A protein has these predicted regions:
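Small-molecule kinase domains that catalyze NTP-dependent phosphoryl transfer to phosphate-bearing small molecules
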Residues: 80-124
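Short strand-turn motif at the edge of the Rossmann-like AdoMet-binding core
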Residues: 40-42, 69
Length: 128
């Protein structure tokens, strides 16, 4: 959302300008960094092709995670954020897409029962 909402200020729709910039950022990371992390809420209908391209670029050496969190837990976590006044329940209900997996090989679900430490441990173990 930083790239799309804050830097480019574009709507989250198919073909939005942030996809091209994300591709460039990831390609730069591929050339210059040991690890590349793309984090955010990405709708399959909009971003699936982008992630397929990135999977191809990295020759399948990717880890994909889906936070499988209920709407109620999402609201709870949102209420604890600094930005919790920017939008509320009404907007979140409109945006909510349960089980919107990217559908990439090896995509893993992270449940709301996992602690932050458990998630970090799992990701670190996966990239070793």
């Amino acid at each position: 959302d930083v790239v799309r909402r804050e830097m480019l200020r574009v709507k989250d729709k198919t073909g939005n300008l942030s996809i091209a910039l994300l591709k460039q950022l990831v390609a730069f990371g591929y050339q210059e960094c040991q690890y590349v992390i793309v984090e955010g809420i990405f709708q399959k209908a909009i971003y699936h092709s982008f992630f397929q391209e990135m999977n191809h670029l990295f020759e399948g050496n990717v880890q994909v995670y889906y936070f499988d969190i209920s709407f109620e837990e999402t609201l709870k976590r949102h209420s604890q954020r600094n930005k919790n006044q920017e939008f509320g329940v009404v907007e979140m209900k409109r945006w909510w897409l349960p089980e919107d997996y990217l559908g990439l090989a090896g995509e893993q679900r992270l449940s709301e029962q996992l602690s932050e430490k458990q998630i970090i441990r799992q990701i670190l173990a996966d990239i070793q």
